[in-house]
Design a protein with these regions (language model features):
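Signature of Gram-negative outer-membrane beta-barrel scaffolds
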Residues: 1-14, 126-131
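Residues on the lipid-exposed face of transmembrane beta-strands in outer-membrane beta-barrel proteins
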Residues: 4-8, 60-64, 110-118, 188-194, ...
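Transmembrane beta-barrel architecture of outer-membrane proteins
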Residues: 1-2, 20-24, 52-58, 64, ...
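C-terminal beta-signal and adjacent terminal beta-strands/loops
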Residues: 24-25, 208-232, 245-248, 254-301
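Gram-negative outer-membrane beta-barrel transporters
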Residues: 70-87, 100-219
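Surface-exposed extracellular loop regions of Gram-negative outer-membrane beta-barrel proteins
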Residues: 8, 12-59, 78, 82-102, ...
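Outer-membrane beta-barrel strand-turn architecture
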Residues: 8-12, 54, 64-72, 86, ...
Length: 301
């Protein structure tokens, strides 16, 4: 598959890059056979045989080494980048629990990564902003929810056809896996630590924060469902059981002591505030572990 990259060095400390790659992913065994919770149904849709997913990925970024301005720093740099990925023939489940291949999935986002290290104090900050995550299909929209009699009645009264969204945020089907595989709009990871006793003792704290998913398929499909409910006297909603998570900040801390050249002891506390939450992109409603304390010794031989 084609791939290329280009880098421009502005100075000894700064550069920009452009990267393009293409990849193929063939259907897995789980996606290509009949079994529990799945059925290989792509041949039911005319023109859709099994084909590999074909991704075209663009990334552009800027990297700057700050040690030229801060010579006493051992490390000090940042990177900012933007990516845009388009995948054709995306595999996902439909409302009949059958795997189908849909036209395309488009994902884009921006990232900022920065770090510093003075020798005594060190830290890092990583920020991710999800800009777009949608799946599109020109024909699947007509195989969902609205019955033909409603279409005919609406056309007879208005002279218009009922429009359905071609693209949906996340996935096209409530029963699909991609509908819950949505990255939060914001994700932030930060770390701050320090070293003592001739670097034999290291301690630090870590923060992980993610926001909620702000977009869903309700906004795109609600006008269509309003018409359907009006003609059928029902109260159907576009979104039934999609998983959603709330924003959460999780704090961890650790203490690491180098006993000898090949022996290290560590004390780690995870989720110190004992938050009850779901990890983003969870496949189930199993919550993340609560407050956890771990003690360990690692030896190298």
């Amino acid at each position: 598959m084609p791939a290329f990259s280009a880098t421009v060095n502005f100075t000894d400390y700064s550069r920009a890059y452009l990267r393009y790659t293409e990849t193929l992913r063939y259907p897995s065994i789980f996606e290509g056979i009949y079994g529990f919770s799945t059925a290989a149904g792509s041949f039911n849709r005319m023109g859709y045989g099994w084909r590999p997913e074909h991704a075209k990925n663009w990334e552009v970024g800027y990297i700057h080494d700050l040690t030229g301005l801060l010579p006493k720093m051992k490390k000090a740099d940042f990177r900012i980048n933007y990516f845009h990925n388009k995948t054709k023939n995306v595999i996902d489940r439909d409302s009949n629990l059958e795997f189908e291949q849909f036209d395309r999935q488009i994902r884009s986002g921006a990232e900022l990564s920065t770090r510093f290290d003075t020798g005594r104090v060190f830290g890092s900050l990583n920020v991710f902003r999800s800009l777009k995550n949608k799946m599109c299909d020109e024909t699947f929209q007509w195989s969902t929810v609205t019955a033909g009699d409603v279409d005919a009645t609406y056309f007879a009264e208005t002279g218009k056809t009922m429009s359905r969204p071609v693209c949906n945020h996340g996935g096209l089907s409530d029963s699909g896996y991609l509908a819950s595989a949505l990255q939060p709009r914001w994700s932030i990871d930060a770390e701050l630590g320090s070293r003592f006793l001739a670097n034999r003792l290291e301690t630090g704290v870590r923060l992980h924060y993610h926001s909620r998913v702000y977009e869903n398929r309700n906004d795109a499909w609600q006008p269509n469902y309003n018409i359907f409910n009006q003609y059928r006297g029902t109260n159907h909603k576009p979104q039934y059981n999609d998983m959603r998570w709330q924003p959460v900040a999780v704090w961890d801390a650790y203490l690491r002591y180098k006993i000898g050249k090949n022996l290290t002891a560590e004390l780690v506390g995870s989720n110190l505030t004992n938050r009850y939450y779901l990890d983003p992109m969870s496949r189930s409603y199993m919550p993340a572990p609560g407050r956890t304390i771990r003690i360990g010794i690692t030896g190298k031989f």
